[in-house]
């Protein structure tokens, strides 16, 4: 601010005037500045003296103004310290925490005018815990959702900003169970799987529930293949049994090597249908028909499965035939059937001519030519066997199917069928180079086995088909895994066969939103502090949240000091962790858990207008301030005198306490009164004898209301000087043989304390095991000592409003005086903080100085105004809760225009000039035509913007021009129509402009 000038002439103006009139008064003399003579020197001397006189004359108004305000005891407002947050780090693998006391000093990377690092101090005690925040989840029982917000194992990773209780990313909640069995489910081709649900004794399964299982909108059944789970397309139900049909062209079941189980998965989509269903077992069965054997081996060679001799063309005792099928013969306890077409071929025995005993003669009789009798060699008895892991055992305990290859039933084609229950101890057998599940038939008895003349009645088999069916022999799962709420519960066949009841589905605890915080160690002891850094401050009161932690007795309420006001604003959450914290597995993570419940389910019902966005969470974080604490500075009074002044060692005093030693000047009644008012500090010796009595004196703004006994003083905070009175309007401190005045105070502050993130990284002195420090947010709110011109304006306004809020201007000026971090403020009457009509309401729309770089400063301003303004305004407005303090919303303006220029070489320069001009014009602080910025609620019009654009030199023509408007939405900037939104609390700002250039045609 420049002082008012009565006479604006300068030294140069005076010299020019003398030079001009000298020709009229002394025509014989000419002023020569290049070769000055005595006259020229005299002119310069005169001009210096005259300019100095004008300067003093012009300053007389300011001097008189200063004298006037001095008479009113006006003063410059002191420096304001910057505030912020600091995060302490401990070494990795640290087992114990560290206590960091209040007033711990930290050094910034920035230096002050004296070349010293700026010093900050912690404002509260904090216990730096070795616990780390490793996981965050949000769940909702009503919506049946689980979302992961954050997860880290080793190194702490930055937290991605998220909205409180927002369903972001994939819903991790799944309701499904997987049935494991090593052989029942193995189906390669077409087949049928039966799953029978066995309800608990107190439960019945209705037809509606069973039918719900068959609807893929409710439940999806799938089975594991080599490409993953493949759904069944055909699901039916009969009574309590679900029938899953597998088509022949479908992929075969696949067994994972590590688990050695075939799997069927049931994914439940509509949970509410099955919420009350409890089971005690699940029985399994499969059925398949007309399965061809995988391999048939006879006589050490693999046979053609379409038609073959099971024992060769010339069977003999102990010949064997092997039927192999991994699918069929590992179905332990299932009913297995084998069907085949059996025919017999008559194959002559190959005879050796040397064995013919004919007595040849020259002349022979007819009887001499008679040959031996021919015999039919047939199979009378076979034995069916299976491999049990140690050797081959009988498949049938009796003579069943021993005569299956006998010709007793005729030699014409027959369809044979044999059935048996697959043994439970059947194992794979190694036959030639193939290891598989198989059975074999071995010849035990052959009729006419040793005859050498005749025919082999050899069996011929074709169309071999295998079948299996578990009907009546259902199996329990070897393992049943239930997946609910990201938890896994396992039941083995023993559990299931012992009728252990279990619910089919388990829903989340509670019907509201719950936010879970998982720590790798128990965050115990304290005070532990955690910073919740929010993107913005909510205008309204937020829904109540309940903090809990997990113990042996379950969830317990947690006593926290929540400075965020239920995440309405950025702040610290403080607690002292109890030692009954225990680990719990939630969401497949074994952690020490804290949870935050939306107890009224307000977020779930979408009743909140504002959803907090949390940008960061920092554990082991506390408040800091750009001040230094000085305790017990002693001052000596040599001789009590009127208007005594004493200087402190430091300037820019913020907070101060003055104690005076009045050991010999107090009566008993005064001691009692001062003790009651907590203004007395008595120091005792080791023997219990009073050594000194210190009395706390009070700071006042002036001595006009003080009397001779008033223990009052004044403080010049900017200079660090104490002022005492004359003994009539305020007491005089007594003298003593030692120092009689003790001062505790803090000093510092200033705009230099406003630092960027990570600019504070050192401790002034080591503290415990603290290894790192850093400021996770910008420090804010620091102001220098008020300059004299701002003081003139403020004090002049004070004379107008007298610290009483009556008019809108009064509210605005008093707000600026209460908080010097305000760059713009506008008062609205009859409107609430949302810009809506409300009778009797007063709303102050405040723009902080650092609005572009720091959101936290507004919260500080808001607190100061709510603390200061009620003393200056109608108590009814405050009592009815109709005083609102909010900040303006920014309307980002983006311009799309077609610009025509003369030459391509002009494009770069004009584009830069145009962007700069728009940036300057739309600046909310220094924009507009008058460079005084835009008033709150004033938005530039289309014509005003066009006027600025047309003023750029070099533009030939401006074609199609469109102005787009954007505001901050929940998920970023969103475009709005300027005609359909309430702009009463808005300020413009420049966005990114889309300027398309072209060259004017010749």
Segments from the language model and where they lie:
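Short flexible coil/turn linkers enriched for glycine and charged/polar residues
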Residues: 79-80, 378, 524, 652, ...
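Glycine- and acidic
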Residues: 365-370, 530-532, 792-801, 899, ...
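Extended assembly-interface regions of large multimeric machines
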Residues: 1-652, 659, 664
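An aromatic-glycine-centered, glycine-rich loop/turn in mixed alpha/beta architecture
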Residues: 912-1002
């Amino acid at each position: 601010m420049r002082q008012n000038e009565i006479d604006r002439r300068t030294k140069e103006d005076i010299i020019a005037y003398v030079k001009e009139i000298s020709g009229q008064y002394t025509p014989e003399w000419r002023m020569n500045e290049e070769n000055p003579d005595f006259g020229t020197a005299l002119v310069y001397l005169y001009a210096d003296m005259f300019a100095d006189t004008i300067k003093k004359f012009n300053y007389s108004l300011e001097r008189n103004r200063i004298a006037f305000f001095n008479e009113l005891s006006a003063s410059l407002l002191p420096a304001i310290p910057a505030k912020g947050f600091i995060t302490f780090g401990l070494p990795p693998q640290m087992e114990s925490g560290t206590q960091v006391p209040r007033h711990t000093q930290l050094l910034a990377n920035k230096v002050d005018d004296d070349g010293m690092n700026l010093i900050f101090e912690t404002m509260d005690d904090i216990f730096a815990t070795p616990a780390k925040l490793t996981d965050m989840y949000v769940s909702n029982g009503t919506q049946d959702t689980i979302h992961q917000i954050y997860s880290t194992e080793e190194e702490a990773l930055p937290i991605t900003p998220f909205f409180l209780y927002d369903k972001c990313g994939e819903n991790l909640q799944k309701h499904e169970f997987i049935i494991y069995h090593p052989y029942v489910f193995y189906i390669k081709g077409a087949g049928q799987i039966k799953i029978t649900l066995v309800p608990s004794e107190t439960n019945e399964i209705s037809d509606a529930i069973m039918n719900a299982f068959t609807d893929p909108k409710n439940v999806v059944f799938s089975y594991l293949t080599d490409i993953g789970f493949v759904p069944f397309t055909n699901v039916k139900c009969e009574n309590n049994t679900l029938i899953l049909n597998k088509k022949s062209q479908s992929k075969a079941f696949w067994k994972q090597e590590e688990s050695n189980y075939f799997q069927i998965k049931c994914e439940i989509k509509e949970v509410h249908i099955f919420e009350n269903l409890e089971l005690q077992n699940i029985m399994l069965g499969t059925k398949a028909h007309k399965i061809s054997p995988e391999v048939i081996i006879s006589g050490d060679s693999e046979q053609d499965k379409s038609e073959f001799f099971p024992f060769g063309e010339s069977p003999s005792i102990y010949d064997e035939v092997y039927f192999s099928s991994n699918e069929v013969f590992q179905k332990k306890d299932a009913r297995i059937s084998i069907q085949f077409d059996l025919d017999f071929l008559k194959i002559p025995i190959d005879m050796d001519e040397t064995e013919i005993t004919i007595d040849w003669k020259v002349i022979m009789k007819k009887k001499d030519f008679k040959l031996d009798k021919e015999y039919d060699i047939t199979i009378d008895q076979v034995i069916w066997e299976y491999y049990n892991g140690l050797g081959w055992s009988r498949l049938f305990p009796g003579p069943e199917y021993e005569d299956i290859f006998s010709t007793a039933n005729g030699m014409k084609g027959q369809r044979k069928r044999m059935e048996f229950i697959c043994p439970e101890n059947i194992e794979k057998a190694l036959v030639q180079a193939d290891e598989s599940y198989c059975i074999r038939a071995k010849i035990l008895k052959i009729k006419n086995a040793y005859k050498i003349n005749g025919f082999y009645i050899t069996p011929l088999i074709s169309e071999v088909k295998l079948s299996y069916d578990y009907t009546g022999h259902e199996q329990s799962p070897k393992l049943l895994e239930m997946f609910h709420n990201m938890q896994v519960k396992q039941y083995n066949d023993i559990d299931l066969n012992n009728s252990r009841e279990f619910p089919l589905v388990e829903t989340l605890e509670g019907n509201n939103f719950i936010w879970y915080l998982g720590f790798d160690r128990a965050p115990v002891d304290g005070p532990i502090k955690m910073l919740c850094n929010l993107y913005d401050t909510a205008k309204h009161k937020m829904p109540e949240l309940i903090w809990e932690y997990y113990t042996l007795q379950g969830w317990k309420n947690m006593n926290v000091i929540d400075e965020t006001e239920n995440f309405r604003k950025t702040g610290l959450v403080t607690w002292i962790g109890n030692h009954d914290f225990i680990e719990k597995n939630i969401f497949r993570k074994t952690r020490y858990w804290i949870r935050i419940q939306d107890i009224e389910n307000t977020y779930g019902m979408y009743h909140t207008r504002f959803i907090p966005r949390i940008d960061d969470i920092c554990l082991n974080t506390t408040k800091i301030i750009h001040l230094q604490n000085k305790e017990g500075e002693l001052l000596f009074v040599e001789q009590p005198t009127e208007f005594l002044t004493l200087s402190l060692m430091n300037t820019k005093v913020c907070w101060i306490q003055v104690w005076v030693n009045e050991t010999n000047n107090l009566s008993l009644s005064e001691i009692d009164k001062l003790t009651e008012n907590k203004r007395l500090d008595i120091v005792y010796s080791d023997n219990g004898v009073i050594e000194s009595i210190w009395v706390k004196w009070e700071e006042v703004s002036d001595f006009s209301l003080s009397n001779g006994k008033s223990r009052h003083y004044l403080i010049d905070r900017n200079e660090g000087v104490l002022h005492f009175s004359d003994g009539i309007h305020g007491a005089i401190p007594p003298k003593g043989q030692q120092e009689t005045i003790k001062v505790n105070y803090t000093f510092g502050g200033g705009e230099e304390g406003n630092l960027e993130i990570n600019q504070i990284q050192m401790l002034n002195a080591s503290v415990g095991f603290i290894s790192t420090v850093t400021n996770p947010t910008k420090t804010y709110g620091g102001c220098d000592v008020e300059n004299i011109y701002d003081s003139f304006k403020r004090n002049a306004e004070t004379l107008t409003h007298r610290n009483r809020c009556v008019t809108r201007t009064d509210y605005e000026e008093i707000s600026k005086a209460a908080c010097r971090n305000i760059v713009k403020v506008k008062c609205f009457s009859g409107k609430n903080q949302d810009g809506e009509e409300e009778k009797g309401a007063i709303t102050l729309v405040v723009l902080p100085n650092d609005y572009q770089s720091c959101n936290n400063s507004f919260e500080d301003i808001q607190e100061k105004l709510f603390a200061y303004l009620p003393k200056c305004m109608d108590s009814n407005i405050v009592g009815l809760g109709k005083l609102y303090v909010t900040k303006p919303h920014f309307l980002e303006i983006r311009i799309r225009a077609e610009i025509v220029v003369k030459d391509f070489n002009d494009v770069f320069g004009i584009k830069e000039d145009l962007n700069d001009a728009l940036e300057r014009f739309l600046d909310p602080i220094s924009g507009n035509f008058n460079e005084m910025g835009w008033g709150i609620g004033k938005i530039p019009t289309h014509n005003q913007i066009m006027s600025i654009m047309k003023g750029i030199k070099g533009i030939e023509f401006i074609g199609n021009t469109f102005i787009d408007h954007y505001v901050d939405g929940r998920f970023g900037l969103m475009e709005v129509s300027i005609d359909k939104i309430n702009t009463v609390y808005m300020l413009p700002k420049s966005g990114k402009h889309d300027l398309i250039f072209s060259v004017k045609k010749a």
